[in-house]
Amino acid sequence: MTFVKKSADKTPIVDNVFSIVSKAKQDKQQNGSENVIDATIGSLYGEDEQLVALDEVFNHYDAIDHRTKAAYASSFSGNPDYRKAVYEWVKQDADVKLAHSVIATPGGSGAVSMSIETFLDAGDTLIIPDIAWGNYALMASVNNIDVERYHMFEEDHFNLCSVKETIQKVMLKQDHICMIINDPCHNPTGYSLTKEEWKELIAFLNEVSKTHSVVLLNDIAYIDYSYQLSTSRDYMETFNDISDNVMIVVEFSCSKALTSYGLRCGGAVILAQKEEAVREAEIFMEKKARATWSNIPNAAMSNFVWIVTEGKDPYMKEKQKYIDLMKKRSEIFLEEADQVGLAHYPYKEGFFVTLKMKDNVYRDAFHKALMAAHIYTVAVNKGIRVAVCSLPVAKVYGLAEKMKEIERSLN
């Protein structure tokens, strides 16, 4: 006898990231933090190996009236000023001319999961990269949605050919397409598409839309740590070229932008050529929000609005220090990796660098050997994720060489 619904996946969840983080923590306690390289943590850490909580974010949050913190949001779709601020923040200087709306969500995870449930039925197929944040597949699975994966890379660039082949395969079995592009600052490789790659992608989606409706979910969780921050939104201008039968939902997260991982604040920005198309998606998302989380934290929304308006300049200045720090860390690691011949996927910017693995059997052996040497990383599909977002500079130096030595010992 069972009590859960018949369609439920009863396989216990295994979160590989948290289990490895726990092993690294235990090793530090036993052998001393100075003897352990912990490149697992996917949050921004300072050189003191402590979580960064931006002063310009939390000093104002602490000053918010307790009643504001205690109160419900004014709407389950989000406070009006917050929804407006999210749209303006997401697009910034990009000249986006599409009809739009914003639904407030508990973080970027809430935005992505709500979008998947909005556009796909049980038995449908979601298209995602073969190297990706593991939660995409889990979000699909809990809704009995299948997953088809495109190959992320062809040599050192985005594999548009694989995207096309994967979409064409899915087109044979359903009359609508829903796919995820995590860009810029892809998790876990640090790749960012060029504007030309975006143009080619949009052009192809327009071709697909002649026979199938298309929804593109653009997960921008890490965009506010782009190394080219002033031009990080330029690619969004390619969205203006979408056909009437294409919709884009930009999935925004305050977790990284405001170092507010636990406040659960984000939004789904719906974009389409026609207002009625946006409204149709908005109606379902409003109901989904009301039925699932009711509303998101009122004070988190209030804080975001203040930061991106009155508090913007000092916030941007403080955050830039950590962007520069992460850039320094990644440059050191990549330079040394290239010197010793440690293969990695094409990295441009972001929280993570991912080493190339020929297959997952070899990856697992390498991952185990790294841990035996007190080096903790996260195994991803055909890769080993190195979190430069949390690794202090002193521990970045020499890491690539240590990894290469371990690789040689396996070969």
Predicted regions and their residues:
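Well-ordered, non-membrane alpha-helical segments in soluble/globular domains
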Residues: I13-K23, L54-V57, V163-E165, K195-F204, ...
